[in-house]
């Protein structure tokens, strides 16, 4: 039994899961690929369910999704689903619209099944320190090249000293994120994560160091690494 700490803020989690994962070149959306006899999405949701102050998880689904409600985890009383949009921003906003009486929201990629509870707790603890919010991130360690898109040639090397690799979850105040996303849509600005929307509106979320094991399943080889982490229970080590 999970008891909610009444002295801590209640949090809603939104998991955009409307993508089809075209880069994986498979018939099933990548969030429904199985690792260790469970789908990637089930692994992702299970970690979020462990935190006592996440009172509800909203999963934004593709309107043609025929997989989610076949999963046993979909019947968990803390999980609901909504129809997402064509883009991530629309899927997140679809989730925010149904949020009531909660001040904070976490947005987490459906295909990051290796999030550790330790990192989740570290991020949530930031609520007491920064009213804007925060994201998990890691300093860039590789050399980054800017390319000519058509010819795929290196044009110049990007100075990496102040560069961070954005991860999820990302944590913000509900109304602040909702307003920033609406402005992004109104201004027709393209963003790839929620922090970008806040940055566009003049806010600066904190960067919280996250684990390198919190990988996003994008390419087939990512499945091998995720399987290794989950099989050997080394996510929190």
Curated annotation (Swiss-Prot):
Catalytic activity, reaction form: 2-C-methyl-D-erythritol 4-phosphate + CTP + H(+) = 4-CDP-2-C-methyl-D-erythritol + diphosphate
GO-annotated molecular function? 2-C-methyl-D-erythritol 4-phosphate cytidylyltransferase activity
Q: Where is this site: Positions MEP for the nucleophilic attack?
A: 160, 216
Which Gene3D superfamilies would you find in this protein's record? Spore Coat Polysaccharide Biosynthesis Protein SpsA, Chain A (3.90.550.10)
Task: Pinpoint the site Transition state stabilizer.
Answer: 23, 30
Q: Which InterPro entries does this UniProt record tie to the protein?
A: IspD (IPR001228), IspD/TarI (IPR034683), IspD/TarI_cytidylyltransf_bact (IPR050088), ISPD_synthase_CS (IPR018294), Nucleotide-diphossugar_trans (IPR029044)
Q: EC no.? A: 2.7.7.60
Q: Kindly state which keywords UniProt assigns to this record, in alphabetical order.
A: Isoprene biosynthesis, Nucleotidyltransferase, Transferase
Organism superkingdom: Bacteria
Q: Give the pathway.
A: Isoprenoid biosynthesis; isopentenyl diphosphate biosynthesis via DXP pathway; isopentenyl diphosphate from 1-deoxy-D-xylulose 5-phosphate: step 2/6
Q: Which GO terms describe its biological process?
A: isopentenyl diphosphate biosynthetic process, methylerythritol 4-phosphate pathway
A Pfam family annotated for this UniProt entry: IspD
SUBUNIT field: Homodimer.
**Family membership noted in the UniProt record:** Belongs to the IspD/TarI cytidylyltransferase family. IspD subfamily.
**Function summary:** Catalyzes the formation of 4-diphosphocytidyl-2-C-methyl-D-erythritol from CTP and 2-C-methyl-D-erythritol 4-phosphate (MEP).
Q: What name appears for this protein in its UniProt entry?
A: 2-C-methyl-D-erythritol 4-phosphate cytidylyltransferase
